Amino acid sequence: MRKIFLVLSICFVSIFFVVSCASREIYVYFNTDCIIDISGIHSNKAKTNISAFLDETDNTLSTSIVNSDISKINKAQANEIIYVKDPTIYLLNLAKEIYEFDSSFNPAIFPIVELWNFSPETFTGIAVDSIPDEATIAVALQSCSFENIVWDSSNNSVYKTDTNAKIDFGGIAKGYACDGSFELAKDMRQIVINIGGTIKTNHEITVHIKNPRPENNQFAAKILVPENNAIATSGDYERYYFYNNQRYHHIFDSSGHPAWVNSDNPILSVSIVGPSATICDALSTLLFINGLNTQMELILSNYSSSALILYEDHYEKYGELSVEFLESNYL
């Protein structure tokens, strides 16, 4: 784990936020920067507790740490029982809740993620010479049903019905880490937690959303995040590579292909604002795959969340969201 002390505003891959503070600390977990901006009595103790929490969470939920819960599940044989920690069961239950509403949010898509070389161990961002063929994708999809993962919340046991089934909480873990860190800092006067671009704050802040296809401006819009709310953004510009001049990104739909990859009007990014960073994280992935429709509006309403969806030359918005656009494409 790496820790850095800074007094400057930091620009990140997907989101930039500005907040005045005396100091901030950056830790590296989940293969990303985790920024802790808090001030108040006993703030140093709170930061120490947050660092310990992030370390434990990463070691529990990572797909790349050998002895994590997720790695143990992924390496297990069919019907081999694995006993896991409370956060794993909590996220399995929450993921199932969202999956049952719309199966596009599927933590069991990880065999497809690996097939396309988007796992932490294989992704490089360098243009590739080939992509998976349809037959290979079809075989991998056979192991990608979330129904292959079975767990018992009463004793924290998990097993798989398919040896090749694997899970990945990449679409929800940063939000969980953000909410948990925020809770540990709840007695502080000023709080902004930023876990790889998933942000939660106890006071109103302005967040700059990166322009997915920057030409004139680095940022596409500014969103006002109310107090005790969070924001998460998913986009096709975060992890991608090119093949035959076509961009392939890391967010997969149920066909086993990157969402919108062959569309003439693809979604480029989705930002969700709401009270739960975990839910914002999950819904930004879900809406990136599905776009804004009646069903997505219902789930946003159920979770008291708002959405901003950016296309190449227009946008869609749902809910009470204060947005100022900075890029001419969206004015």
Segments predicted by a language model, with ranges:
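Mature catalytic core of soluble alpha/beta enzymes
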Residues: R2-L8, F12-L331
